[in-house]
């Protein structure tokens, strides 16, 4: 087989997408305070699903570098709604990384960026590609979950969480 090049995207972001933030804000608009922490379901964002579907089709691994400005713990005098939106934003970055086989790295100080980029580059150089033929040959467009495990404790097993059977 020929050697194929790995496709990866490094996303430098606080995770706060203004379009999604406005949708999150609408979801919480008339809720009492006790319902705010669980009001936003990060995985249900249409925008997030479009990003994930495109990444799936392109075979891209996404590595979010999370800026400190998106850390809910660093908000000055935050409201319940702000904390909920920032937590949802961080959760979306994690969902993107998990789904595409990447890793979220959190930047605490801007001086760390070079080290984090180097960490992603090292990760890309040490990944192995494993292919398999599924037993279920139906191309029904349904989501199929993947689990990869290794018995060698020196190895780290990380994979996309699944694929659409097309």
Question: Regions from the language model: what does each represent?
Answer:
Residues 1-166:
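Scaffold/interface architecture of coatomer-like assemblies
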């Amino acid at each position: 087989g020929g050697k194929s090049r790995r496709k990866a995207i490094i996303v430098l972001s606080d995770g706060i997408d203004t379009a999604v933030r406005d949708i999150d804000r609408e979801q919480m608009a008339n809720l009492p305070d006790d319902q705010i922490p669980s009001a936003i379901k990060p995985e249900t964002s249409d925008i997030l699903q479009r990003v994930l579907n495109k990444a799936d089709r392109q075979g891209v691994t996404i590595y979010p570098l999370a800026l400190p400005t998106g850390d809910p713990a660093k908000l000055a005098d935050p409201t319940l709604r702000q904390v909920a939106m920032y937590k949802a934003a961080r959760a979306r970055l994690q969902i993107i990384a998990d789904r595409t086989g990447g890793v979220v790295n959190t930047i605490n100080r801007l001086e760390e960026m070079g080290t984090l980029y180097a960490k992603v580059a090292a990760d890309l150089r040490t990944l192995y590609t494993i292919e398999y033929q599924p037993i279920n040959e139906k191309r029904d467009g349904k989501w199929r979950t993947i689990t990869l495990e290794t018995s060698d404790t020196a190895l780290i097993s990380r994979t996309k969480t699944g694929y659409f059977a097309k």
